[in-house]
Amino acid sequence: LKTGMIVAERYEILGKIGTGGMADVYKAKDHKLNRFVAVKVLKPEFREDTTFIKKFRSEAQAAAVLTHPNIVNVFDVGDDNGVYYIVMELIEGITLKEYISKKGKLSVKEATSIAIQVSMGLEAAHSHGIVHRDVKPQNIIISMDGKVKVTDFGIARAASSNTISSN
């Protein structure tokens, strides 16, 4: 996607803020609600796999029911002429991976605080029957004010095969 593009007649792409194996993440302006959001867009090489697309959408919809201070909120999911996207809360901060790279070894107090916040987010997801399955430093965001949030619930389950449910 290019800066200035409008997705779903609503989200104006402002620039790329991250990339992963299956999707790119952009900062965008939601013109309907007048706020900044993160828009995760499925990479083109995955757009032809209908099974993957179904899982991507259903898991994103499942993650959207999660509302917790330690989970990145999902606001919307859809596709715009073959551009499959998930709209999420925009967290101004860095991933735990970036944080560790910059800071080096964490203190016991800091590591414990991060672990507790991640655990609280995962517990909230588990109470809704949602399993993350891809918890790693890249999927943990530390906001500018120190709040820790887990992200990538939808894509994590959609990306692995035969994972729709473990009831």
PLM regions: where:
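Conserved N-lobe loop of protein kinases adjacent to the ATP-binding glycine-rich P-loop
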Residues: 29-36
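Protein kinase catalytic-loop region centered on the HRD/HxD motif
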Residues: 118-130
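Protein kinase glycine-rich loop
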Residues: 13-20, 25
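Activation-segment/catalytic-loop signature of the eukaryotic protein kinase fold
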Residues: 77
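AlphaC helix of the eukaryotic protein kinase fold
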Residues: 43-65
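Activation segment signature within eukaryotic-like protein kinase domains
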Residues: 114-115
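Activation segment of protein kinases
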Residues: 50, 144-167
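Conserved short submotifs of the Hanks-type protein kinase catalytic core
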Residues: 81-95, 99
